[in-house]
Design a protein with these regions (language model features):
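Alpha-helical subdomain
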Residues: 1-64, 69-70, 156, 161, ...
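Conserved Class I S-adenosyl-L-methionine-dependent methyltransferase catalytic core
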Residues: 6-28, 32-38, 46-47, 53-160
Length: 327
């Protein structure tokens, strides 16, 4: 008789139940309602405006997963929920969960098709303004950690102007310019994203030092006269050939000595670790036909496009910074 069990299969297959329970609890505002004090089931149901029976289902599922604690007849946030999902701290991952629930999760229904056809099946669907805001705010939320780590781990004192290509709503530029007051920044993004970025940066103290330019990385002229160029969460959108083309385009716009700073979910050479990076390859495939890459592959792009690899700097979790210098 074998000791092998199907536990791994069952636990993995149940992953969609765990994520949808978490997404629903977040959208209902469960963790916000428990941010200030523990609540009974009836109090929770009343505050959420849902029946007591369904309030019990969602709350007990969150207890089972470790997001809530239950003592006697009262529910309270666990430390992780209070920190990241209650809205009471700057480390707010609620927008990220909304992004995965409303934008990413529906796309994953097409994973098998994407695997069979070797192309994204959702990337051509245009986001409406509300979806674009959910997308942009969600990406900014999950990138907040590595974005704030970057100016602490990479020294920008040698630079004067930073160009963030595909810069979202400024999640990387803002902490960099805040930490290094000598810098000026340019955010280059697609037109729908720049509208969200303008709103996000309007009241930010570093906003006046950021020039927002709308354009396409491959179709429009890239801004010139920058000596640091950021590609954060960009290369996973494209295949090898397209990434080499992008790096060549950037190299043509800068002088020798300028640096390109590529932030992404880099994997080991086998593309099997870290776990999150290996899994998120499916996210990029289904959405835009993209992929995750290894540090070695980035070095190969550099050799072929006029850059010299300098170093890799871990930022946070599975996200690292790969640095190249124009030669």
């Amino acid at each position: 008789m074998t000791d092998t069990t199907p536990d791994l299969i069952l636990q993995t297959a149940a992953g969609f139940m765990m994520s949808k329970h978490l997404f629903a609890a977040n959208d209902l505002g469960l963790f916000e309602k428990l941010a200030d004090r523990p609540l009974t089931l009836d109090e929770l149901a009343n505050d959420l405006s849902i029946p007591s029976r369904t309030a019990r289902i969602t709350a007990d599922a969150m207890v089972a997963l470790g997001f809530l604690e239950k003592q006697d007849d009262r529910y309270r946030n666990s430390s992780v929920s209070q920190t990241f999902l209650s809205g009471k701290t700057p480390a707010d991952l609620r927008p990220f969960l909304r992004f995965w629930n409303h934008i990413s999760y529906p796309q994953w229904q097409h994973l098998e098709e994407a695997l069979r056809t070797n192309r994204g099946v959702s990337g051509d669907v245009e986001l409406d303004p509300d979806q674009q805001r959910i997308f942009s705010e969600g990406v900014a939320a999950i990138q907040a950690g590595p974005a704030h780590a970057m100016p602490e781990k990479y020294d920008f004192t040698r630079h004067r102007k930073v160009l963030d290509l595909g810069g979202g709503v400024g999640e990387y530029l803002v902490p960099i310019l805040d930490r290094f007051p000598q810098l000026e920044g340019t955010l280059f993004e697609l037109p729908p994203v720049t509208e969200v970025a303008r709103d996000a940066l309007a009241a930010n103290p570093v906003g006046p030092r950021i020039n927002i330019v709308a354009g396409d990385l491959f179709e429009d002229a890239l801004p010139e006269d920058h000596d640091a160029l950021i590609l954060a969460n960009v290369v996973h959108y494209f295949d090898h050939a397209r990434n080499r083309e992008l790096l060549r385009r950037i190299r043509e716009r800068v002088l020798a000595g300028a640096r390109v700073l590529i932030v992404d979910f880099w994997t080991n050479p086998q593309h099997t670790e870290p776990l999150f990076a290996a899994l998120v390859a499916g996210e990029f495939l289904t959405s835009v036909g993209g992929d995750v890459y290894s540090e070695e592959e980035a070095k190969g792009w550099f050799r072929e496009t006029g850059w010299e690899y300098l170093q890799t700097i871990p930022l946070e979790g599975p996200i690292s910074l790969v640095v190249g210098e124009a030669i």
